[in-house]
UniProtKB/Swiss-Prot annotation:
Annotated catalysed reactions: acetaldehyde + NAD(+) + CoA = acetyl-CoA + NADH + H(+)
Encoding gene (name): hsaG
Classification via NCBIfam families: ac_ald_DH_ac (TIGR03215), PRK08300.1 (NF006157)
Protein name, per record: Acetaldehyde dehydrogenase 3
Organism: Rhodococcus jostii (strain RHA1)
Coiled-coil ranges per UniProt: none
Family, similarity comment: Belongs to the acetaldehyde dehydrogenase family.
SMART domains named among the record's database cross-references: Semialdhyde_dh (SM00859)
HAMAP family according to UniProt: Ac_ald_DH_ac
UniProt keyword terms in alphabetical order: Aromatic hydrocarbons catabolism, NAD, Oxidoreductase
Amino acid sequence: MTKASVAIVGSGNISTDLLYKLQRSEWLEPRWMIGIDPESEGLARARKLGLETSAEGVDWLLNQPEKPDLVFEATSAYVHREAAPRYEAAGIRAVDLTPAAVGPAVVPPANLREHLGAPNVNMITCGGQATIPIVYAVSRVVDVPYAEIVASVASVSAGPGTRANIDEFTKTTSRGIETIGGAQRGKAIIILNPADPPMIMRDTIFCAIPEDADRAAITDSIHRVVADIQQYVPGYRLLNEPQFDDPSVVSGGQATVTTFVEVEGAGDFLPPYAGNLDIMTAAATKVGEEIAQKLLSVEA
């Protein structure tokens, strides 16, 4: 089967985990990994797996006679904002795993196929990938005037990039709750849990709903979205059934549905407790595969 050629820009933990997922893909063939640290473990692992590697950054990749069909970038927002127009000029499609948000945001269960023609798509945040689908599941059944998510992740799984971008995380995720999740107003909170041994990612999703909402339909919609996510993140699961509460002072006089989920990683490179990172690489792979299928069908 013909596969779309892929370059991974970035050689850190996320890029390395992504590499293992891409290698299993029926549609994507990782051939290059680009970094800036010649001693990085990611580049060393990529070389052992037969990829062409360079520590000379994006300039090296764009100067190669053969260009990739897709690039997955897991560097920083600043680096990707600089590189994105260069990828587009070279005819390379980009899947952005940084907070740069140059292109439209994609959450597979909600809007996977809406932006397959875009030159650049953004994967929002780990918290967004884990929680926005649940908001979407509720909002496609009833109006959601307000939604709030709390993402709790192991502190050791949050690298310097995550810590430096907490404000961007909350703003980007909150915006995604509204624009993709379908809530009229959204709020996001992230908690870095220092527990040892590290805890698996856990998320709480609150949605305000009409008092007379069809609770069975909402529950069914949530279960269907969870099943969709489990196709590419097997460790994604509900901790219990969605909980419905009647209007109260605590909820601002609105009825609510609360959903609790946890995300256990596949353990490809990152440890299983780092489900917050695993769901990003898994979702990016899913999006890349859909883009590749469209590219290859056009070429055929």
